Structure formats: structure tokens, C-alpha cells
């Protein structure tokens, strides 16, 4: 049980769990078997130590200790270890373990003390919706009615979800751990040994009485119950041991602990463990099913239980948790996460539980599920594809003679300069971007305009052909998302938002339709979109449209034809250059793409991947959903208050008004980082005169201005434009200057041309 996680907010939840369990004994008067002994993460390679450096900075940014240590320091606290092949490690002083049974009973006792009622040995047979909107659950002859259901059914989470015709992508896996006989060396110790995670050998280890308990993430992994549903009658039964599958893993464990060669094994346990397709918990309100929440998929269940319980209670009582949890929200999964996908992806990640998590890392299993019509064309042109919300989309393009694959790194990866060439090529001529994966919604009905004015911060456009950028805010003023609103007519609007935010946006919009005559249709799969931007974009598009792009102001839209193909053109540009988005029925995308590519040769057209777009937006100070745009950030803090109307009422308006009078202490700023520094990937700590004041949310190269850029979330009460700060990257300090946005084309002359 530990606080560290690849996601800082999950680390915060796990830290809460530790504090909760520490205080549980005092509240209920019984011990919960808490042992805070500290723990080492071992590194056998320089690459692993580089990851530890990255993680140390991340954890420092949120106030957690994570110190790099030498092999001799590890040996001094755990003398049984063979450290001869170690590069070093990391030390977590809050690492520990608890007795799961005692914690469970302790939490139940505390819950009952505070009014909870727990009904045991009651299997639910059916779940149905009542006319009142409440739920009816049956168990034999018993009937229960409730407003809220939380599916925390563990091994049976998928089956419970299927009772309401939805799905949770859980795969149950077999997992072994072993317990040794007493070891004289351990018995002779005066202090309990720290916990060990040998990340490169993929095993964990801790003291169990006077012996050791260890387990590994089996390379030859197996689905529990042969991939079938967990039996409803399953209790605490175990599976047959299959040590043949652990042979390679055990060899690595015995190498690390030579004393095991002469130690007996007194217990072998092969039990079930639930995995989500990305190894993270699945929590939150089920999209499209009001009053139904999910809390399952916990690999580190005990470590996460307390914090997730807090977040779920906030979600249910207040409508949202205090922390942004989109990385573990059930809305990150769509209908593409089938049972087959979940199993295939789990088989990939299970043996790699402790793998190095590199920036911009892509999975290889469960791919090519959702394809646009030009997918194969892009691959033939050198596209290295990534997966986003189930869709395949181009990350970058390998030129002729360059191998089309990612080489992962915390430094500048192999694609760095190629992404730069895409950005610079677009700025000199024009660029084509595949944008079909963006979320797209049709909002219709007699109250559509009124609805959009209520849920969005900006005044919704009233006339056809007008566009607005609007923020979706919660009552605390936190940003749920940002959308482009294109007015097609008075009662029909077309919304475009972030690829990863599709189900988040849809769930949020649907939750606020009460009292409005409005329909919301997720049209993401029905429409394709291609972006054309750069100084030659107008000339290219005019050549294919009888000069339809001459009189075409910024933030407007038109229905027109490109080489005879009907499109809706939106004058918006995420690159900050002159540009348009061309939206058409997805069946017409191939013809549109071919026309643009054939004619584009005359205008310097280059292909642009999502990684180049992610860097281009930094130069314009544009914010990204999931990085800068989160429910923890308000428009004033993000520098987006210009998109908040002062002439209408909308969700979050009170918070917006209050921040006009009292600006938030924390805000987002753009930093000009030392040009020789490694990239900022996110979560690097930021210092002012040696004092920690914030962390990086995202970063990259500003190719048009030749600057290394980062966006920082800082305590800005004493920080202004031009001030010098320091960013700690891989435990090295680099100078960073606070600059004003945008650094590229600050007067927007190119954008508004």
C-alpha cells in the first residue's frame, strides 16, 4: 500500500486512504493491522532510474516524498537483498500494508456507527427503473427501492452492469502470491523490513511475520474462470496453483533474494484480481444512466479504497468530486471497449504492471477498432497511428527512409524533429490535419438556444453561420470542457469538442436538459473533419471551391462544396494560423481528402499529426482538455475569462463574478524554458527562489518561435510577466521565464487574415 501513482490525483486519494486507516483505530477502538514500514522501488537500468527521476519531480510537486537511493542504501535497510546488478532505487517512506479483513471490518463498523445499514449475503437478481426515476432491486422475494446505485461488485461488475443493459470493461485474472516459512535472518532483525518492488523483474515483496510474502505479475497470464463470468456462488475459494507459469518470474525473485533457495514455502495462493483495460480504477456516473454509479477495477484496492470512497461520496452528494478524476472516470470508455477488447488489452498490460511509463506511450493490443475512411491512406503516407477514445489517429508522419515507429524516451524522442518539420512546413505553406475523432454533437429543439446559453459560458450564436467558443462549467466554476458552437439555424446547433471528452461532454449535457425541449445527438461517428491551416490555406481551398473562401470572416461557417463535395466549413484554427475545419458526412471524407491532397501539391501542403498540433497550440496560449482544462481550473485561472458572458445567467456564473472581484491565487502561465532543457511532459515542479510554487501541466517545442515552452499551474500571487523561475526536469533545474500569451502572432494578424 503506497501513495505513489502515475496520476497525481490518484496519489492524493491513496494518501487519504493511509490517513483514514491510521485514524480508524482511534475512531472504532480496534486495530486494523496497519504497518507503515517504507518501501523501495528497485532499478536495474539507467532508463528505470530516469523514470524514477521523473516520478520524484512529479511527487515533489504535490508534496510527497520520493527519494532516489543507491544500492548500498537499499542493502542497509534490507540486508537479504542481492543488489549487485542494481543501478539504484527510490524510497517511499509512507509505503506500508494493512490487514484487508481488519480494514474492511473497521470501515464497516465506522459506517454503521454513522448510520449506515449493511445487508450481507444478499444477491441482487434484477435491477429496473421505476416511473419515479428510482431503482427497484430484487433479491429472491425481497424488493428494495433506492435513488442511487453504486456498482462496486468487483468480480461481478460487468454482470451487474448488464442488468441495466450497459457494460463495464472488467477482466478477472488469476494471480499468485507465495508465503515462506520463517527465515532465521528475518527473525533476528529488530525492525520490520521495508516493502520491495523490483520493477524490472516485475515482483513485489514484504515481510509476513518472520517470513516473506512475494508475488509477481505473471508473464504467462491467465483469465480467471477461463474467461467466463465469476460464479455468483464464489466466495473465498482459490484456483489451482500453476507454478509452471511462474518459473521465469520465480527465477528473478530467487536471484534477488538468494536466501530463498534454502527456505521452504508454506503457502501458495492463486486468487482472482480485477483489471480494467488500462489498469486504472473505473469510477463515476455511468453515461446515459442517471443515478447509476460505478466503482470497480481496483488492482490496488486497499490503497485506493479510502480515497475513492471519499471521491464517490462527493460525486453522489455534490454532483462531482473535488479532484479531477477524468483519468479513472468510467466515461473514458465507450462502446468500443468490448469484452474482447478488455481481455486483449489486459493480457498486454498485466505482465507489464511495473513497466516504465514513458511520455506519449501507446498500446499495441486492441487496436484498429474505429477507423476513418482515410486511415489506410495516412498510413501509406508515413503516419504513425495512436489510439484516442477508440479511434485511430495520426500522431506524426515519418518521412521516406525513416522507420515509422515511436522510440520512447523522457528526453527528446525520435519523432521530435519530424514533428517540428510538420509544424514549420505548415507555417510556410499549409497543413492538413485529420480531425474526425473530435467529439461532435447535434443540439436540436425549440429550446436549443436557451439550453446552450444555460450550459455554456459564452453567448450562443443566434444566426446561422455564426460560431462561438463556449466553456462548460460546473457550479464551482471548474471547466468541464470547451466546445465550438456552430449555429445551423435557430433551433439546430453543431458542437465540436475534445476527442477524449466525448462521453464526458455528453453525460454533462444530458444531465442538464431538465426543463428544456432539447435533443442531444452524439454525431461523432457520422461526420468526418479535416483541418486546413497555414498562409496558403485560403488559396488552396479557393482553387477547389470557386473562391468561396474569400469573404469568410473568422468564427463564421458556411455550407459549400469542395471539388463537388458538400461540406460545412468552420473558420476556426487550433494551430493559430489562417485556417478552416471542413466537416462532411464520413462517407465523403475519402473523396474530400483525395481532392485536397492532389491540389495541395501546388500550395506546399504537408500532413500534420496530433503531436505537432499539441505543440502549435502552446505558442498561441491555447489550453488543452485534460491538461489545462479540468474541473479544478476556473476560466480566470486558465486565462479564459474572455469566453464568459456578463450578460446572461449560466452554470458557474456566480463563481465567475466572484473571481472578477477576487482573482484566484493559482493560475496558468506560459513559461519560456531553457532551450537546452529536456521536454516538459507534465507534472514537473516549478520553483521561485527555491520555493515550490506549482507544477507543469504540459509542454513542448514552439517550433515557429524556436522556444522550449511549458504551461505552468502556479501560485501567482507574487509572480508576474518577465519573472524568472526554475523548472525541475529529471531532477535538474532549468531557468524558465514567465511570458505573456500568445508568444506567436500576438496580435492574431495571421489568424484573422
Language-model regions, residue ranges each:
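Flavin-dependent oxidoreductases
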Residues: 127-240, 248-259, 341-362, 366-371, ...
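C-terminal catalytic lobe of FAD-dependent flavoproteins
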Residues: 100, 200, 209, 223, ...
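Short Gly/Pro-enriched turn/cap motifs at secondary-structure boundaries
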Residues: 168-170, 193-197, 203-204, 264, ...
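Dinucleotide-binding Rossmann-like beta1-alpha1 core, especially the glycine-rich loop
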Residues: 2-77, 200-205, 211-213, 347-359, ...
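Glycine/proline-enriched, intrinsically flexible loops and inter-domain linkers
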Residues: 323-324, 329-753
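Flavin (FAD/FMN) cofactor-binding and adjacent substrate-gating region
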Residues: 20-23, 35, 44-120, 125-133, ...
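Central beta-strand plus flanking loop segment that forms part of the substrate or channel wall
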Residues: 1-5, 39-41, 165-191, 248, ...
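General small-molecule cofactor/ligand-binding pocket signal
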Residues: 67-69, 117-119, 263-266, 519-523, ...
